[in-house]
Amino acid sequence: MPVKKIMVVDDSPTERLVLTDLLIRNGYVVVAADSGEQAIVMAKQELPDLILMDVVMPGMNGYQATRTISREEATKHIPIIMCTSKDQETDRIWGMRQGARDYLVKPLDSTELLAKVGSFN
């Protein structure tokens, strides 16, 4: 099934808006969350086809939310791409170990982002 609904998780309203606008202009339905806690709740309610997850957020960070979403029975099938400024190899490895399927470093290149999103079609 092609990716149609994407959840954008980022505590920055600007980042959420930029990603949401890019994805909508490219034919995707977008839902957004501003925290790890909200992402977990919304993942169960919305059942998106893909999640773009920031790492650095107050409260529950993106690694913790990814681990929870990727282990919950109702949501473990949803692929997660980490989108973060944390660019060290150890950060990428840790993200993948928490259940992320891919990892993009900010600032995001829109062409690369759309290619990665499209690879889940």
Segments (PLM) and residue ranges:
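Receiver (REC) domain active-site loop signature in two-component systems and cognate sites
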Residues: M57
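Active-site beta3 strand of CheY-like receiver
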Residues: E46-L52
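Short hydrophobic/Thr-rich beta-strand motif most characteristic of the beta2 strand and flanking loop
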Residues: G27-D34, M42
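Short, glycine/charged-rich "phosphate-handling" switch motifs in NTP-dependent
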Residues: R101
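Charged docking surfaces used in two-component/phosphorelay signaling
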Residues: L17-R25
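C-terminal output helix
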Residues: L108-V117
